[in-house]
A protein has these predicted regions:
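Conserved AAA+ ATPase core "coupling" helix
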Residues: 1-47
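Alpha-helix capping/termination and helix-coil
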Residues: 8, 36, 49-56, 78
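P-loop NTPase catalytic core
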Residues: 43-49, 57, 69
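C-terminal engagement/docking regions of AAA+ P-loop ATPases
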Residues: 54-135
Length: 135
């Protein structure tokens, strides 16, 4: 009832106040674009994505466009953590959330009640996280 009554006086969207100015958002996006990803991290991402394309429970793995989106979200995670570079934990923070809708389970997986999240967790656990090299 409250939702219906709320629409009597116009759209509730019209009463929303902005939480950030457009210029600030654009500046943040530019700063995220500048976040550095080392080749070791790119290789880590590529290995994770390749595993989505080879997994026996998946009909479709993450696409190139999905991989680009993942890299963008990884950079955003680093930015939100106050860094201008990506670390493996940034990949961990976003991998499941970004990719669960970008893969398609095959019929065997669906019949066995396997979830996209479960497959992604398995893939993530099966790929070694890069660690700093010791001299």
């Amino acid at each position: 009832i409250a939702i219906l009554k709320d629409h009597r006086s116009g759209s509730p969207v019209d009463r929303i106040s902005p939480v950030i100015q457009m210029n600030d958002l654009l500046t943040m996006q530019e700063e995220v674009d500048k976040i550095f990803i080392h080749d070791v991290i790119y290789n880590y991402i590529a290995e994770l994505i390749a595993k989505t394309r080879q997994h026996p429970m998946l009909e479709l793995g993450v696409s190139p466009r999905g991989t680009i989106a993942l890299a963008g979200m990884i950079k955003a995670a680093a930015y939100l953590a106050g860094r201008n570079y990506v670390v493996p934990n940034d990949v961990e923070k976003v991998f499941l959330a970004v990719n669960h809708h970008r893969i398609r389970l095959n019929s065997k997986a669906r019949a066995n009640h396997v979830t996209a999240e479960g497959v992604l967790e398995e893939i993530f656990a099966g790929v070694a996280k890069p660690s700093p090299k010791k001299n």
